[in-house]
Amino acid sequence: FPLVKAEWWERHQLLVSLAWALLFLVPFLFAYGAEATAEQLAEVIIGDYIPFIVLLMGLYVVAGGIHIGGTIAGTTRNNVIILLIGSFLASWVGTTGAAMLLIRPLLRANLWRRHRAHVVIFFIFLVANAGGCLTPLGDPPLFLGYLRGVPFFWTLEHIWPVLLVNVVLLIGLFVAVDRHFMRKEGRENYRQLELLTRADDRVPIHLQGWHNLFFLLIIIVGVILNGLIPQLGAFVDAETGRTFGVDVFGAHIGLEYVAQISLICLAMILSWLTTSTDDRSRNNFEWAPIAEVARLFIGIFVTMIPALAILRAHGGSLGLDSPLGFFWATGALSSFLDNSPTYVVFLTTAGALGTDAAGAVVTTIGTVDPSILLAISAGAVFMGAVTYIGNAPNFMVKSIAEGAGVKMPSFFGYIGWALAFLVPVFVVDSLLFF
C-alpha cells in the first residue's frame, strides 16, 4: 500500500493494520475459543506492544525537546563527527531519539551542498540502526529481548567488537563517498561553505532544552528496574516465583512492569510540560511519526502470534542451528519486515533449540546459545538498515530529509545503496564473528 497508493495509505493506516489483525483473530477465535484468544491477545498487547510503544514514545518526546543550535559547516570531518556522536548516543537514547536529535543539525550543516542524499543514507546506516546495538534502550528488538530475560548489559559485553568493525568500515566508506561528491560541488556552493566557516559570523554550538537529559536518565532507570526488580526477593511472591502483581487473561502485570511504564510516562509528561514550544518548534516536532508507528505495530504484533506459536512448537526442527544461519536469516527478514517482531521470532526459534553451551542465556522462552543470540541481535539491528521499512527511524529520517529539500533515493534506489555498502560489511561480519 505505501508504495502503490501512498495517499490512501496515509489516511487508512490504522484500518489496514486492524484488518490484518482481524484476519488472524477471527479464525483463531472460532478454532480455539474466546478464552484462548484473550490470553494470546493479552500476552502480546500487555506483554510486548504497550512497553514497546511507551518506550519509543518516551524517547521520541524527550529527545524532541532537546535542540542543538549553532553554526556547523558540513565538511567531511564535521559530518564524521556527527555520525560518530550519533552512533554512540543511539544505544543510550534509542535509535529514534538519536536520529531525531541529530538529523536536523546534520541537514542544516550540509545546506550548502547540492549532493546531500549520501550523508542522510549513511546517517540511517549508522545512527538509526547500527549504533543502537549495545543496550535494550538502543533498538526495539533488543528491548523485546530484554523483556524476555536477556540481561540488560549482555549485548554491551558481547556485541561491541562487531559494532566497532562496522563503524570503522562504514565511516571509511562514507569518507570516500563524501569526498567524491565534494569534488562535484560548484564554486557557488564552496562560497557558501566559506561563509559558514568565517569565524566572525559563527554562532557557537549550544544546547537548548538540556533539562531533558535528566528525563532521559529517568527512562533509563525505568528500563533497568524492569530487569532488576524480579531479582529482589522482597518483591517476589514465594508461592508463584513471580513479582507481586495481577494477571489479566494470563498476562502478568508485576511491579517491574508498573515501575517501568510509570517512570517512562512520568519522564514524557514532565518533558512535555517543561519544554518550551519554541524549543520543540525549532526541532519541527510533530506527533505524526510516532502515531504512525503506533498504528502499524498494533497489527504487526497481533499477526506475529501464530508465527511465534509455530516456532515454539517446531523451532528445533527448522534446520536453522548455526550462528551464521541465524545472522543472515534474521537479517534478511529484518530488512523487509520490521526488525522487532523478526527478532522475537528467531529468539523463539533459538529458545526451542535449547543448549548446554558455556555462557548460555536463560530467557523466558528457553535457554539460548550465546553465539546464536549474538547473531540474532546483530542481524536484527544491523540489517534493519537495508530498507526504509526495516526499522522505525529509517522512514522518519527520510521524511525529515525530504522536507528539508534533500532528494532521497526511491525505495529500491535506497536498497541499491545498501547492497553496495552494507552487504560487503555484513560479509566481513560473517567471516570475523559468525
Model-derived segments and spans:
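Hydrophobic core segments of alpha-helical transmembrane domains in multi-pass membrane transport
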Residues: 1, 20-30, 56-64, 86, ...
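Transmembrane alpha-helix boundary signature
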Residues: 3-7, 25-48, 60-74, 88-101, ...
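Interfacial loop-to-helix junctions that mark the boundaries of transmembrane helices
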Residues: 8-15, 37-50, 152-162, 203-207, ...
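Alpha-helical transmembrane segments
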Residues: 43-56, 154-173, 246-265, 328-335, ...
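Long, contiguous bundles of hydrophobic transmembrane helices that form the permeation core
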Residues: 170-238
